[in-house]
């Protein structure tokens, strides 16, 4: 009996260490039951914990969090992404779905649903919801995209100038 208790304690300790390690990467982790429209917080930043609490109804709390946390231009995308009533279908042939969004603070995040459990028919019943800060990568990506756009514009201008020069030269000759 004592060995069984020690083994159980060792398993719990290992699970806590795993959650702690993953929580360094994701600022929020929820376990969600799609059948009962419920979630349970595994780990979250204090501001989100205050907003959503330890557990609740997905349809209610995720709507409240989205309305208060997501930038206006990403509201519709996130309403669709966070819609738990369509999630099982979206995950039918996949193990995860994700999207990027900007918070009202201006910080970029990536949200992801990961399949945790399927029923005997293969339908998704439970998922993990995780989100992480991708602000540095997103800003770098946007800056690179802008630099590429500028370079392409400059190349186009140079090409037009060269074409115009050659046209005038051939006309003069």
Task: Go through each PLM region and give its residues.
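PAS/Per-ARNT-Sim sensory domains
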Residues: 58-86, 93-94
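Primarily the dimerization/phosphotransfer
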Residues: 23, 147-173
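Short loop/turn elements at sensory-signaling interfaces that couple input to output
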Residues: 111-138
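PAS-family sensory domains
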Residues: 99-107
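PAS-family sensory domain signal
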Residues: 17-69
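Generic recognition of flexible, low-complexity loop/linker segments
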Residues: 15-19, 29, 86-88, 98-100, ...
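PAS-associated C-terminal cap
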Residues: 1-14, 132-157
């Amino acid at each position: 009996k004592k060995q069984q208790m020690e083994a159980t304690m060792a398993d719990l300790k290992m699970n806590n260490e795993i959650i702690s390690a993953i929580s360094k990467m994701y600022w929020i982790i929820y376990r969600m039951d799609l059948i009962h429209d419920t979630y349970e917080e595994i780990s979250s930043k204090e501001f989100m914990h205050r907003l959503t609490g330890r557990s609740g109804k997905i349809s209610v709390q995720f709507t409240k969090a989205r309305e208060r946390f997501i930038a206006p231009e990403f509201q519709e995308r996130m309403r669709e992404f966070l819609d738990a009533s369509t999630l099982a279908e979206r995950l039918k042939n996949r193990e995860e779905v994700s999207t990027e969004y900007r918070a009202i603070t201006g910080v970029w995040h990536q949200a992801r649903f990961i399949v945790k459990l399927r029923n005997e028919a293969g339908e998704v019943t439970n998922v993990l919801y995780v989100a992480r800060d991708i602000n540095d990568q997103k800003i770098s990506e946007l800056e690179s995209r802008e630099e590429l756009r500028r370079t392409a514009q400059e190349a186009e201008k140079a090409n037009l100038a060269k074409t115009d020069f050659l046209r005038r030269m051939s006309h003069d000759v």
